[in-house]
Amino acid sequence: MKLSTPEEVKAFNRNTYSALFKGALVGSSLGIAGWLIGNRYSAGFRRLPFSLKSWLVIGSGSGASIIFADKAGLKFEAERYGKFDQIDYSTKGLPWNQRALYYFNEHKWPIILGTWASTMGLSLYAASRNRYDTAPQKLIQARMYAQGVTVVVLLGSVYLSTLANRLEPLEREVLVTDPSNPTKLVAFKQRKERYPGELQWEVLVSQDEERLRKLNLPLREPHGSTGPMSTPTPALNSSRSA
């Protein structure tokens, strides 16, 4: 995301903090509901120590807050820069491995959270078949397996993100909304940033052009016009001779 002004940075931070709070509230509410249901209908859950029960609330609140913040950032960028942003990346022409990497980067956090939840469920099912362990021991085993798999997935996501950035072409054609006609899509060649903020000037130019359009001003000075930028400056030699 490209934030060009301090006001946009503040607005983005407010939006992110609000989404974090909402996600933590929703996730914690679901965790508390699961806690209450488990205490009422499961004798094994009631025998668990308080630390394991509280981990259910903390884990669900943290995971939901991350997902909410990620979705809020994408929504903020789409609302603020929708007319300059990409509409269709047209990944059909890319090889299958690059399409898979692109899909993983777009849905990274839901995949990680889903992997943790599915591993936790499968581990609980496998541990429940052992008749010699107690319920707390089964839950601890399931949590260890789930955490181990989640750590492996996190490390793999870092590697895949680095690999996707390395395989991304330096220039690709995307479709963007025509500022003069919002119902029309035009082809645009997007260049890859070699370092963060390299193409920041393009966003600034687009914003300035949009401001000039709202004021009904020309985007460029007419050729041969006399203005502050076209006023000739006297040469040093002529001023000295005078």
From Swiss-Prot:
Residues 227-242 have a biased composition (Polar residues). Keywords: Membrane, Mitochondrion, Transmembrane, Transmembrane helix. PROSITE patterns: HIG1. It comes from Schizosaccharomyces pombe (strain 972 / ATCC 24843). This is Respiratory supercomplex factor 2 homolog C1565.01. Cytochrome c oxidase subunit which plays a role in assembly of respiratory supercomplexes. InterPro entries: Hypoxia_induced_domain, Rcf2. Pfam families: HIG_1_N.
